Amino acid sequence: QAARQVDTLFVIPVKEDRSEFSYTERKAMLEAGCRNIGNVIVCEGSDYSISAATFPTYFLKELDEAATTQMSLDLNLCAKRIASALGAKIRFVGNEPFDAMTQRYNELMHEILPLEGISVVEMARLSERDRAISASAVRTALAEGKFSEAAPKVYPTTIPYLLAKLATMAL
């Protein structure tokens, strides 16, 4: 949906290696999923975009005044350094029905980015049986060895990565 609204859509993966899938794996999944969308560029992640360097409380999931300050710093860096370098005037983001930290980040995005000339477009997540799909649900299904629950929640090009993860877990 986002790619239809702009000439070039830049996708910037979070560079931190703090999940079940490494940055390299996540970037490869994004590249595979976007391969046939001609105007999408999957960029290298940055140490200055939703990173432990600028936004450590995101990874601690502590929603407090420090977190809000760090979110503001992260969003200002995004606007003044990253978006300006790319010439990006719109930031697309998925809505967040589950995580209070990310909900607050989205709220601040709507406050801060327009001041820098960047529109924010918040899009509804894909859903399954009237429930928004989350990465947490996929991770939980994988941890429980329930591939049949995880697979419908991801893009088809991601399935080989899920199978590889399950195979590694089985060893």
Ranges and model annotations:
Residues Q1-L171:
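Nucleotidyltransferase catalytic core that binds NTPs
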